[in-house]
UniProtKB/Swiss-Prot annotation:
Coiled coil region boundaries: none
Family of this protein: Belongs to the bacterial ribosomal protein bL35 family.
Protein name: Large ribosomal subunit protein bL35
Keyword vocabulary terms for this entry: Ribonucleoprotein, Ribosomal protein
Species of origin: Wolbachia sp. subsp. Drosophila simulans (strain wRi)
GO molecular function: structural constituent of ribosome
InterPro entries membership: Ribosomal_bL35, Ribosomal_bL35-like, Ribosomal_bL35_CS, Ribosomal_bL35_sf
Gene responsible for this protein: rpmI
GO cellular component: a single term: ribosome
Length: 68
């Protein structure tokens, strides 16, 4: 009997990436609206990517069975 392939969640595939060591990378959150209230340094620091914590990355990896 053939094993069934597990599907990867498309939404997770678009938002997160895995490093070579297995850490989960995502873009910084909280940059959609309300930027007028924030300081310029805060806005600047939210550019780029961030590495997710242990508990969050475990959840993301459940939805990416083949580490795409």
């Amino acid at each position: 009997m053939k094993k069934i392939k597990l599907k990867t969640k498309s939404s997770v595939k678009k938002r997160f990436h895995l490093t070579a060591k297995g850490k989960v990378i995502s873009t910084q959150s909280g940059k959609r609206h309300g930027m007028v209230k924030r300081s310029k340094s805060n806005i600047r620091n939210q550019r780029g990517t961030t590495i997710l914590g242990k508990s969050d990355s475990r959840i993301v990896k459940l939805h990416m069975p083949y580490g795409i």
